[in-house]
Amino acid sequence: MLSTPLQRKLGLRHPIVAAPMFLISNKEMIVACAEAGILGSMPSLNARTPEAFRDDLAWIRARTDRPFAINLTIGLTDPARLEADYALCEEFDVPVLLTSYGNPTSWVKRAHAHGMQVFHDVISLHHGQKAVAAGVDGIIAVGAGAGGHAGRISPFALVPWLKEALGVPILAAGCISDGRQVVASLALGAELCYVGTRFIASTECGAVDRYKQMVVDSGPEDVVYTDRVSGIHANFLKATLPEGDFGADRSPAGAKRWRDIWSAGQGVAQVHDILPIAQIVEDMMREAHDVAAGLARG
């Protein structure tokens, strides 16, 4: 059985986290992931208001008692909204916080006082060192090829590098869409696999059907790494990007651009169908166990 200390600590059946994805991760995904034995998550900002976020948390709590996570984008969120969202995480006893874009120090202290685990995403050793100094419980190593905002270092270099240098649990992010990649990530030293793109093509995901089908139909060469959407380098599906420069301010023309420009990682290469999350997890872990057993046999 594939199992890691962090997986057991969090009470998960499988070493997988469904990564929080802007606009499309939702409460339905969180519950489906929880029931499938993995850690589901969503950005708090996917709820338009703190009141809507409260409703989402209440809906989740009414349907599962299993672990889940909330992503707080601490450096990009209005301070009043961030404070309101964090307070709701405490109120509903969210067990895991996933923090990004900023210094997590003050949030780690508060979260630990409430019994929460905190994992922070990084793309470099420098940022990893700062996060460890802040007291996080683990690092999300976002490698090249990951969907959304991603780094430039291959996960094959980044994960073992951060594992050796930082001495804290590592969550591997980038190009994990099937069981082979789960086994490879664990072999590199990751304790959990941070999977986003594969779950876009799930029935529970909030993405529109055309987005899901584009993930199925795309290959790695259809993914573009650019900073022209938000000013921060990220991976997007080439077919959804407008031609030419986006303008000097790099800002979306209202919310519409964010809904029309679709993110995905190079892991689209291993996405071949749209399935319920429970089936995706079952297939992924069956393949992972088969691969691990085959390697053990030699």
Where are these regions (language model features)?
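Conserved active-site-proximal phosphate/metal-binding subdomains
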Residues: 152-171, 177-298
